[in-house]
A protein has these predicted regions:
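Short hydrophobic alpha-helices and adjacent helix-cap/hinge residues
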Residues: 2-9, 22-180
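N-terminal signal peptide c-region/cleavage motif recognized by signal peptidases
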Residues: 17-21
Length: 180
């Protein structure tokens, strides 16, 4: 009897590990897709004023798990002739003013609320929480029918001196600044 219980416990643990592995794989896949979107957002946008000219395009996030995937996906890619540097930043740090693009995952929503947005005047701001654009962001990812979609606040981008291609805007849901 004990042997049967132990067997079923082992099977249960294996099933839980398999479910966890599938969830981790889905999260990695979603992060990889979002990194690809970020690459294309940057590729099809023009910065009228560089955030801080440093000789490379700096993609930042406070989420190290996302950055691990983004580093792999964006390895040896370029944006406007510049190599991409993926950088971990803290949202309360002055270093965020050196980012060309900042991606804020849902885990960092509370820090985003208190972030000094004046440090991000010429930075493309992308997030994934429902109120991200209302809280000062430019682009927000959301899921619809199991697919990653995005919405853009073009007027907010314009205030940051960033012009996004109309081709990308046609693929997005357009929102007005402060709306969601």
């Amino acid at each position: 009897m004990r042997l049967i219980k132990r067997f079923f416990k082992s099977v249960g643990v294996l099933l839980l590990l398999q479910v966890a592995a599938v969830n981790a794989e889905l999260n990695d896949k979603e992060a990889a897709l979002k990194a690809g979107f970020l690459f294309n957002f940057a590729r099809y946008s023009d910065w009228q004023v560089a955030a801080t000219p440093v000789g490379y395009f700096k993609l930042c996030s406070p989420d190290s798990d996302f950055l691990d995937t983004a580093s792999w996906v964006l390895h040896q890619q370029t944006i406007h002739g510049l190599g991409i540097k993926v950088a971990l930043v803290e949202l309360d740090s002055l270093n965020i003013n050196q980012c060309n693009l900042l991606f804020v995952t849902h885990r960092y929503r509370e820090q985003w609320v208190t972030t000094d947005k004046s440090l991000l005047l010429h930075t493309m701001l992308v997030g994934e929480t429902p109120d991200f654009i209302k809280l000062g962001g430019h682009i927000r990812f959301f899921l619809a029918s199991g697919k990653i979609r995005f919405e853009v606040a073009p007027e907010s981008l314009k205030k940051a001196d960033i012009v996004m291609s109309s081709k990308v805007l046609r693929l997005s849901r357009i929102v007005k600044e402060g709306e969601q």
